[in-house]
Amino acid sequence: MDVLEIDDGLWRWTAFHEEWNEQVGCVYVETEDGVVLIDPLVPNEDTAKFWKALDRDVKKRKGPVHVLITVFWHARSAAEMRERYDARIWGPSAGKAAIARRTGVVTDAFGPDDELPGGIEAHRTARAAEVVYWVPEHSALVPGDVLLADGKGGARMCPESWLPASKTPRDLAASLRPLLDLPVRRVLVSHGRPVLTGGGRALARALEL
């Protein structure tokens, strides 16, 4: 488990994902509406240390815990967060049933333009059941699977094989292009190394075809 403080109130940690057989990234955000966890996964090493730190932070914030899921494949430890903190589980309405099969419940299914905790926004993608979160307070994008690290310090779109049969990389790029209008500084990918500076440029390069 690696833990990185990116900004005041914004952290990213990694945990080993047994199905992927690799480390994946998860995001912790402190907001006025409580603690927000995006695609959280409890590490299978240093587990007690992880829970102790998170318990402390949740207690310090004195507010509810919200779990935001980008895509049903990233339900991960959402059910454990609900059991431990009575967390609200948020997910895109198009993926509600698939998320619920993995978590037991989706307390808050949202659609386009719905208000999310802490002023976080959800942006649609060419994968109907997946969103990209925008955390304006930290100028950070948090994608699930549609954007990945490119291994060179930047980002890239997911492989075409990950898209629905009716969609192409051009469709994915078009769905993500509105994100270029945001003042993106960071792209906190789940798979690979996050982009911590120059996120807007990295995003623009990722969408070039």
Language-model regions, residue ranges each:
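Short, exposed beta-strand/loop patches in secreted or surface proteins that constitute
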Residues: 1-5, 28, 113
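Active-site metal-binding motif and surrounding structural segment of the metallo-beta-lactamase
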Residues: 44-92
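Short hydrophobic/charged patches on amphipathic alpha-helices used for structural packing
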Residues: 26, 51, 55, 176-177
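Short, well-ordered beta-strand micro-motif
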Residues: 12, 28-30, 134-136
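Hydrophobic, well-structured mid-protein blocks that either form specific transmembrane helices
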Residues: 75-124
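Short, hydrophobic/aromatic-rich segments at coil-to-beta transitions
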Residues: 7-14, 117-121
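Metallo-beta-lactamase
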Residues: 2, 17-22, 34-45, 121-209
